[in-house]
Amino acid sequence: MGVYLAVLFSLLVIEMAILFILVLPLPQRMRRWLYIRYSIISTNKKFRTYMVGIMIFVGLLFIDSWKRSQIRVSTYRNQKNPYIINSVTPVDALASRAYNQRNVYISGFIIYFYICILTVMSILRRIVEWNDKMKAGDDILKEKLRRKQKYLEELQKKKF
């Protein structure tokens, strides 16, 4: 139980750190570097297989914990007959419910952050591509400006 919880927490912390770095206002060079690294990693078939497997396990944990945390809890004794056995939910059942609710929260946040990372990387890809197009457009515009300046100089020479 301790190892699997440590793995879940470490996965959650890693995802939070990645998302934090991605949303920082970094310079364009750093954004491009992050996007290139993400592209390299995401095209690796082994990595994608591992990530899909991990997310399937986390999703199954989420569903299982959700179902197990939906037990009916009774904290009061039966008023009509207070001597009925098991009229109050046992402490073990309450503890199990609390553990399952904790697992729902942790696995839900892992899934949520994974979706957020994919979304932010999509936005980052668009930003990097848009800036590359702008730079390419700048070069084209500079070349057009040079040609027009040459043409203007030629016209001025012809005038005199």
Curated annotation (Swiss-Prot):
Pfam families assigned to the protein according to its UniProt record, in alphabetical order: Bap31 (PF05529)
Cytoplasmic compartment residues: 24-45, 125-160
GO biological process, one term: protein localization to endoplasmic reticulum exit site
Membrane topology: Multi-pass membrane protein
Compartments, record wording: Endoplasmic reticulum membrane
Record carries keyword Metal-binding: no
Residue ranges that the Swiss-Prot or TrEMBL entry lists as coiled coil: none
Motif range (Di-lysine motif): 157-160
Keyword Ion transport applies: no
Predominant location: endoplasmic reticulum
Functional note: May play a role in anterograde transport of membrane proteins from the endoplasmic reticulum to the Golgi.
Domain notes: The di-lysine motif confers endoplasmic reticulum localization for type I membrane proteins.
Family: Belongs to the BCAP29/BCAP31 family.
Protein name, as recorded: Endoplasmic reticulum transmembrane protein 2
Organism from which the protein derives: Saccharomyces cerevisiae (strain ATCC 204508 / S288c) (Baker's yeast)
Primary gene name: YET2
